[in-house]
Amino acid sequence: MDFVAKNLTKLRETNPLVQNITNYVVMNSTANSLLALGASPVMAHAMDELEEMVSIASSLVVNIGTLDEYWIPSMEKAAKIATDLKKPIILDPVGAGATKLRTKTALKILDFADISVLRGNFGEIAAVLGEHGKTRGVDSVAYDSNEAIELSKNAAKEFNTVSAVTGPIDYVSNGKELYAISNGHPMLSKVTGTGCASTSIIGAFSAVDEPLKAAVSGLTVYGISAEMAFAEAPYPGTFQAKVYDWLYRIDEKLVLEKAKVNKFEI
């Protein structure tokens, strides 16, 4: 897809500031992923600075991975400010379906905020749609390609957003169009925070294109980087470092050579 390659160049030219209200587990790896790609990360969740920070950010990423009584109001306030300012908001409902708190928090944000992209695994997206029993902790335990296609379309329509259901094949839909992305590698599941990083990378691309193409761009670039990383480092520890390297090294030429993206009209 030509637009993916062009968006990569645009991102590096503009160096967008991506505000992340994310979980403790992935702050470092997410920030490094964004820096390697060519974006600028900021991890800011203090209530007293949200208005200032959201106003200067290019996009907002909300990740519910480590919730508590302080972070939930921060996420909600930031999402409201970003909605008022018409900034792209990317929501990652980490572990939705595993506990009532996670599902409730994700649904509340989806209800009042203008979410540009909802990115999660099969179980998480199924949970926010009310289809239970497919999540264990923060990991999806069931995946069926046909179900994932329907899930992506249905979530997009239900929440009036772009829905990205990630797994062996990533499906991205706005309810009218559907993209299938076959890039990536199973080793991503052996390193914590890779899904969270992909969400923040979508946030970076949301600064340079509309939500559907931003999500496709982010997942394609991250998937190709993972493939290239595994070819050089087939073990989890060195693989993670190589993903950073390839997020830095990937260029338009490599995207055009390696992208495995198909578009379908719904």
From Swiss-Prot:
GO biological process, alphabetically ordered: thiamine biosynthetic process; thiamine diphosphate biosynthetic process
Entry GO MF terms: ATP binding; hydroxyethylthiazole kinase activity; magnesium ion binding
Binding site for substrate: M43, G193
Record keyword Kinase present: yes
Entry keyword set: ATP-binding, Kinase, Magnesium, Metal-binding, Nucleotide-binding, Thiamine biosynthesis, Transferase
Residues noted as binding ATP in the record, renumbered to the chain: R119, T166
Recorded metabolic or biological pathway in which this protein acts: Cofactor biosynthesis; thiamine diphosphate biosynthesis; 4-methyl-5-(2-phosphoethyl)-thiazole from 5-(2-hydroxyethyl)-4-methylthiazole: step 1/1
Catalysed reactions listed for this entry: 5-(2-hydroxyethyl)-4-methylthiazole + ATP = 4-methyl-5-(2-phosphooxyethyl)-thiazole + ADP + H(+)
EC number: 2.7.1.50
Disulfide cross-links: none
Cofactor field: Mg(2+)
InterPro entries given in the database record: Hyethyz_kinase (IPR000417), Ribokinase-like (IPR029056)
Family under the similarity heading: Belongs to the Thz kinase family.
Biological role stated in the UniProt entry: Catalyzes the phosphorylation of the hydroxyl group of 4-methyl-5-beta-hydroxyethylthiazole (THZ).
NCBIfam families, per database record: PRK09355.1, thiM
Official protein name in the record: Hydroxyethylthiazole kinase
Organism: Methanococcus maripaludis (strain C7 / ATCC BAA-1331)
